[in-house]
């Protein structure tokens, strides 16, 4: 199941992301965050990854935002 959820992210990393300049505002890119979240939390990791993508915009804080040990849709406070 996790492989199926991760496959579209790997496709994005391999074929779509290289076409555009780097733009992620966080350390641990959004696509890598989603992969780690899926590996750690299963389907809930997809929700965490989508939440992270929505937080990745020019007006957000930058910096470290590691995948939390517990499911959460908020930014990991340990990363600040």
From Swiss-Prot:
Name of this chain's protein: Putative membrane protein insertion efficiency factor
Gene Ontology cellular-component terms listed: plasma membrane
Membrane topology reported for the UniProt record: Peripheral membrane protein
Any coiled-coil regions, as ranges: none
Annotated function: Could be involved in insertion of integral membrane proteins into the membrane.
Subcellular localization(s) per the UniProt record: Cell membrane
Keyword Acetylation: no
Matches recorded under Pfam families: YidD
Segments traversing the membrane: none
Record-linked InterPro entries: Membr_insert_effic_factor_YidD
Keywords per UniProt: Cell membrane, Membrane
Composition bias type Basic and acidic residues, residue spans: 62-80
Family, similarity comment: Belongs to the UPF0161 family.
Main location: membrane
Region called Disordered, residue ranges: 61-80
